[in-house]
């Protein structure tokens, strides 16, 4: 007799379909979420809908590898979830993509970055639109300052009721202010998506707590990044802490734990995933720092050397300085002192900084640290008991690809091919 298919069977089939293309499944849910939000924005005001809401939607759908959503999914699957929780996991993944939009749009404003994913950054796009309408020339960009990054939102509030003509607001200033609002809208939509999702009663509290913690950590990391620039922080330990908060936890660790919480993982399993995610997440940000200096702009979508021009105290920079000081290398220190924080730094001067990173051994030390962190990350998976070995292999491969490390086979299986994650191409 033919067995009657149950709801559990259908849920299993849905989960397996997502397994085959997690990014595609996240895209489909994002389409649904954004469609509803765009309708709400247009109903509030047509101009706002076109200028801000549609840009948020295009930015969110226009790039990235859906990294955070993939970690939610494989965290869920490794812990035995799927079926009834698949829909909730995909909505969480969509919400995380909107948080990423907020983070990248705001980051570009604070850094004065002109490009994102090989295209004009959102603030630059708005500036270009309104500069053309008003006939304004874009002023020469000066070095970004800590104070301006913090105060921009307040200045917009003070002048929002006045037109560009009466307030003297330039297209440059308007573009930055509009981008701040776009990032705010993306974060609001992310929160709405989480709040509107039906989670299992046993997981709801844990997922919401992880979500709240993640948002605070992300903002704290961005503040430390700004603070490090204005104070010229030289501490490798502080650089690591900034990297953990700004990117590592919300990119890898927290999404993994959200998936595990949805699946009802026990403390031991959640602890292993936390440690694995923390190591891979830090390696991810350190690899991003490496790409920011040595990456090919054609592949990363961002100009090479901008971290140097902005004076960011990355782990790479702080280690190079510490090694130069220990060796008494005044020449290397002179190159770093002259270059870091110079917004008009030439390509030749950037090359000299690259040479210092190599000659001091900072680049090699960073590459070794990335590989070590990747190895530690996947080592934490070795003791996990799972009913789905294929899911464990996928997670193993994703962790190593995210870390920018060389792939190798997980215990008990062949390596799974995962596209290498180019952080500077939109994942940060």
Question: Which role fits each region the language model picked out?
Answer:
Residues 1-428:
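All-alpha prenyltransferase/terpene-synthase fold signal
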């Amino acid at each position: 007799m033919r067995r009657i298919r149950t709801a559990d069977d259908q849920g299993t089939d849905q989960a397996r379909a997502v397994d085959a293309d997690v990014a595609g499944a996240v895209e489909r849910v994002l389409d649904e979420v954004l469609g509803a939000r765009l309708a709400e924005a247009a109903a509030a005001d047509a101009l706002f809908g076109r200028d801000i809401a549609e840009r948020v939607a295009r930015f969110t759908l226009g790039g990235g590898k859906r990294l955070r959503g993939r970690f939610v999914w494989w965290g869920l699957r490794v812990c035995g979830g799927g079926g009834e929780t698949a829909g909730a996991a995909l909505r969480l993944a969509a919400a995380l993509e909107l948080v990423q939009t907020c983070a990248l749009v705001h980051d570009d404003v604070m850094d004065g970055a002109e490009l994102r994913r090989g295209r004009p950054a959102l603030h630059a796009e708005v500036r270009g639109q309104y500069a053309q309408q008003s006939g304004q020339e874009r002023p020469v960009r000066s070095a970004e300052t800590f104070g301006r990054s913090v105060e921009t939102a307040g200045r917009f509030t003070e002048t929002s009721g006045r037109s560009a003509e009466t307030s003297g607001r330039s297209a440059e200033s308007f573009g930055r202010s509009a981008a701040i609002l776009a990032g705010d809208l993306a974060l609001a939509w992310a929160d709405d998506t989480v709040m509107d999702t039906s989670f299992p009663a046993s997981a709801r509290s844990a997922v919401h707590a992880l979500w709240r913690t993640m948002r605070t950590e992300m903002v704290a990391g961005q503040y430390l990044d700004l603070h490090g620039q204005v104070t010229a922080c030289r501490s490798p330990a502080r650089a690591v802490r900034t990297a953990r908060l700004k990117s590592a936890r919300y990119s890898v660790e927290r999404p993994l734990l959200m998936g595990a919480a949805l699946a009802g993982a026990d403390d031991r399993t959640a602890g292993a995933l936390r440690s694995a995610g923390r190591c891979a997440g830090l390696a991810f940000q350190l690899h991003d720092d490496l790409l920011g200096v040595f990456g090919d702009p054609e592949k990363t979508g961002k100009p090479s050397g901008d971290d140097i021009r902005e004076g960011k105290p990355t782990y790479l920079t702080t280690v190079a300085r510490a090694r130069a000081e220990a060796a008494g290398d005044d020449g290397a220190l002179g190159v770093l002192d002259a270059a870091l924080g110079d917004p008009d730094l030439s390509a030749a001067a950037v090359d000299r900084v690259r040479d210092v990173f190599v000659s001091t051994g900072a680049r090699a030390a960073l590459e070794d640290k990335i590989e070590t962190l990747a190895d530690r990350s996947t080592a934490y998976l070795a003791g996990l008991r799972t009913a789905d070995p294929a899911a464990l292999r996928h997670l193993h491969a994703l962790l190593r690809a995210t870390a920018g490390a060389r792939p190798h086979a997980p215990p008990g299986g062949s390596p799974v091919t995962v596209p290498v994650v180019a952080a500077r191409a939109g994942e940060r």
